[in-house]
A protein has these predicted regions:
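Surface-exposed acidic/polar loop and edge beta-strand patches at domain peripheries
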Residues: 1-185
Protein backbone atom coordinates (compact mmCIF):
# COMPACT_ATOMS: atom_id res chain seq x y z
CA UNK A 1 0.00 0.00 0.00
CA UNK A 2 1.11 3.52 -0.74
CA UNK A 3 -0.08 6.99 0.19
CA UNK A 4 0.58 10.16 -1.77
CA UNK A 5 1.72 12.16 1.27
CA UNK A 6 5.48 11.84 0.85
CA UNK A 7 5.05 9.24 -1.93
CA UNK A 8 5.26 6.62 0.83
CA UNK A 9 5.26 2.85 0.73
CA UNK A 10 3.52 1.98 3.99
CA UNK A 11 2.65 -1.71 3.65
CA UNK A 12 4.11 -4.63 1.71
CA UNK A 13 2.67 -8.11 2.14
CA UNK A 14 5.15 -10.94 1.63
CA UNK A 15 4.46 -14.66 2.07
CA UNK A 16 6.37 -16.40 4.84
CA UNK A 17 7.67 -19.99 4.77
CA UNK A 18 4.16 -21.33 5.38
CA UNK A 19 2.65 -19.15 2.65
CA UNK A 20 0.99 -16.70 5.06
CA UNK A 21 1.26 -13.09 3.86
CA UNK A 22 2.56 -10.61 6.41
CA UNK A 23 3.51 -6.95 6.29
CA UNK A 24 7.30 -6.40 6.27
CA UNK A 25 7.22 -2.57 6.24
CA UNK A 26 7.19 -0.63 9.50
CA UNK A 27 4.74 2.23 9.61
CA UNK A 28 2.31 4.20 11.69
CA UNK A 29 -1.12 3.24 12.97
CA UNK A 30 -3.15 5.31 10.50
CA UNK A 31 -2.71 7.64 7.53
CA UNK A 32 -3.31 10.78 9.62
CA UNK A 33 -0.31 9.97 11.84
CA UNK A 34 2.08 10.50 8.91
CA UNK A 35 1.44 14.27 9.08
CA UNK A 36 3.48 14.40 12.31
CA UNK A 37 6.02 11.71 11.39
CA UNK A 38 9.56 12.74 12.35
CA UNK A 39 11.13 9.41 11.29
CA UNK A 40 10.01 9.61 7.63
CA UNK A 41 8.46 6.12 7.72
CA UNK A 42 8.24 4.91 4.11
CA UNK A 43 8.74 8.41 2.68
CA UNK A 44 10.53 9.54 -0.44
CA UNK A 45 13.23 11.77 1.02
CA UNK A 46 14.63 14.54 -1.13
CA UNK A 47 15.65 16.37 -3.17
CA UNK A 48 18.73 15.30 -1.19
CA UNK A 49 18.85 12.53 1.40
CA UNK A 50 21.31 12.97 4.22
CA UNK A 51 23.01 16.05 5.58
CA UNK A 52 24.49 19.07 3.83
CA UNK A 53 27.10 20.86 5.96
CA UNK A 54 25.81 24.17 7.29
CA UNK A 55 23.06 24.02 4.64
CA UNK A 56 25.43 25.42 2.01
CA UNK A 57 25.83 24.34 -1.59
CA UNK A 58 28.04 26.88 -3.34
CA UNK A 59 26.23 30.23 -3.07
CA UNK A 60 22.93 28.56 -2.16
CA UNK A 61 21.90 28.69 1.50
CA UNK A 62 19.42 25.96 2.38
CA UNK A 63 17.31 25.69 5.50
CA UNK A 64 19.32 24.54 8.53
CA UNK A 65 16.80 22.07 9.94
CA UNK A 66 19.20 19.69 11.74
CA UNK A 67 21.11 21.96 14.09
CA UNK A 68 23.46 23.95 11.86
CA UNK A 69 23.03 21.49 8.97
CA UNK A 70 20.40 20.71 6.34
CA UNK A 71 18.85 17.23 6.22
CA UNK A 72 16.47 15.33 3.92
CA UNK A 73 15.32 18.33 1.86
CA UNK A 74 14.36 20.44 4.86
CA UNK A 75 11.11 20.84 6.74
CA UNK A 76 9.23 21.11 3.43
CA UNK A 77 11.13 18.32 1.70
CA UNK A 78 9.52 15.65 -0.45
CA UNK A 79 8.44 13.54 2.52
CA UNK A 80 6.16 16.42 3.57
CA UNK A 81 4.57 17.04 0.16
CA UNK A 82 1.45 15.63 -1.47
CA UNK A 83 2.40 13.97 -4.77
CA UNK A 84 0.28 13.32 -7.84
CA UNK A 85 0.05 9.69 -8.86
CA UNK A 86 -1.00 7.21 -11.53
CA UNK A 87 -1.38 3.45 -11.34
CA UNK A 88 -0.85 0.72 -13.90
CA UNK A 89 -1.70 -2.97 -13.78
CA UNK A 90 -0.62 -5.56 -16.34
CA UNK A 91 -0.39 -9.34 -16.32
CA UNK A 92 3.31 -8.99 -15.37
CA UNK A 93 3.22 -6.27 -12.69
CA UNK A 94 1.34 -3.60 -10.79
CA UNK A 95 2.85 -0.16 -10.25
CA UNK A 96 2.18 3.26 -8.84
CA UNK A 97 4.11 6.29 -10.11
CA UNK A 98 4.20 9.45 -8.02
CA UNK A 99 5.12 12.82 -9.53
CA UNK A 100 5.99 16.18 -8.01
CA UNK A 101 7.29 19.53 -9.22
CA UNK A 102 9.85 20.71 -6.69
CA UNK A 103 10.53 24.46 -6.83
CA UNK A 104 12.86 26.93 -5.10
CA UNK A 105 9.79 28.32 -3.33
CA UNK A 106 8.88 24.96 -1.80
CA UNK A 107 12.24 23.40 -0.90
CA UNK A 108 14.86 26.10 -1.54
CA UNK A 109 16.92 24.19 -4.12
CA UNK A 110 17.68 25.87 -7.48
CA UNK A 111 15.49 25.11 -10.49
CA UNK A 112 12.14 23.53 -11.19
CA UNK A 113 12.68 19.81 -10.70
CA UNK A 114 10.21 17.29 -12.10
CA UNK A 115 10.57 14.28 -9.83
CA UNK A 116 9.07 10.82 -10.26
CA UNK A 117 9.17 7.70 -8.12
CA UNK A 118 7.70 4.38 -9.16
CA UNK A 119 7.02 1.35 -7.01
CA UNK A 120 6.57 -1.76 -9.17
CA UNK A 121 5.69 -5.20 -7.84
CA UNK A 122 6.10 -7.96 -10.41
CA UNK A 123 4.36 -11.33 -10.62
CA UNK A 124 7.27 -13.01 -8.79
CA UNK A 125 6.96 -10.60 -5.86
CA UNK A 126 10.03 -8.51 -6.71
CA UNK A 127 9.71 -4.85 -5.67
CA UNK A 128 11.53 -2.32 -7.87
CA UNK A 129 11.84 1.34 -6.86
CA UNK A 130 12.77 3.78 -9.64
CA UNK A 131 13.52 7.48 -9.05
CA UNK A 132 14.06 10.06 -11.78
CA UNK A 133 14.39 13.81 -11.94
CA UNK A 134 14.73 16.47 -14.63
CA UNK A 135 15.55 20.05 -13.69
CA UNK A 136 15.48 23.42 -15.45
CA UNK A 137 18.97 24.24 -14.12
CA UNK A 138 21.88 22.73 -12.23
CA UNK A 139 20.77 21.50 -8.83
CA UNK A 140 21.31 18.75 -6.28
CA UNK A 141 19.48 15.43 -6.73
CA UNK A 142 20.15 12.54 -4.37
CA UNK A 143 16.81 11.18 -3.12
CA UNK A 144 16.19 7.97 -1.24
CA UNK A 145 13.34 5.79 -0.16
CA UNK A 146 13.10 5.85 3.64
CA UNK A 147 11.34 2.51 4.04
CA UNK A 148 11.95 0.64 7.28
CA UNK A 149 11.78 -3.12 6.81
CA UNK A 150 11.35 -5.83 9.43
CA UNK A 151 11.50 -9.09 7.55
CA UNK A 152 10.03 -11.13 10.40
CA UNK A 153 6.58 -9.90 9.34
CA UNK A 154 4.37 -7.66 11.45
CA UNK A 155 7.55 -6.77 13.41
CA UNK A 156 7.34 -10.02 15.42
CA UNK A 157 11.08 -10.07 16.12
CA UNK A 158 13.48 -7.18 16.72
CA UNK A 159 15.58 -5.87 13.86
CA UNK A 160 18.69 -6.83 15.86
CA UNK A 161 18.05 -10.42 14.76
CA UNK A 162 18.43 -9.46 11.08
CA UNK A 163 21.64 -9.70 9.08
CA UNK A 164 22.29 -7.14 6.33
CA UNK A 165 24.78 -8.04 3.64
CA UNK A 166 25.82 -5.43 1.07
CA UNK A 167 27.73 -6.19 -2.11
CA UNK A 168 30.02 -3.17 -1.95
CA UNK A 169 33.76 -2.74 -1.86
CA UNK A 170 33.82 0.58 0.01
CA UNK A 171 31.75 2.67 2.39
CA UNK A 172 31.84 6.44 2.80
CA UNK A 173 33.01 7.53 6.23
CA UNK A 174 30.87 9.95 8.27
CA UNK A 175 32.08 12.35 10.95
CA UNK A 176 30.47 12.88 14.38
CA UNK A 177 27.84 15.20 12.80
CA UNK A 178 26.98 12.40 10.34
CA UNK A 179 28.44 14.39 7.45
CA UNK A 180 30.49 12.63 4.73
CA UNK A 181 34.22 13.14 5.24
CA UNK A 182 35.10 12.18 1.67
CA UNK A 183 37.13 9.22 2.94
CA UNK A 184 36.27 5.74 1.74
CA UNK A 185 36.90 2.59 3.77
Amino acid sequence: SCINYGARLIRLLVPDREGQSENVVLGLADAEAYGNDQASFGATVGPVAGRIAEGKWGAVQLEQNAGKHHIHGGSRGWGQQFWGFTTEETAEAVSVTFSLESTPETVGYPGRLQAKISYTLDAEGCLTITMTGACSEETLFNPTSHIYFNLSGEAKRPITEHILQLACEEVLELDTDKLPTGKKR
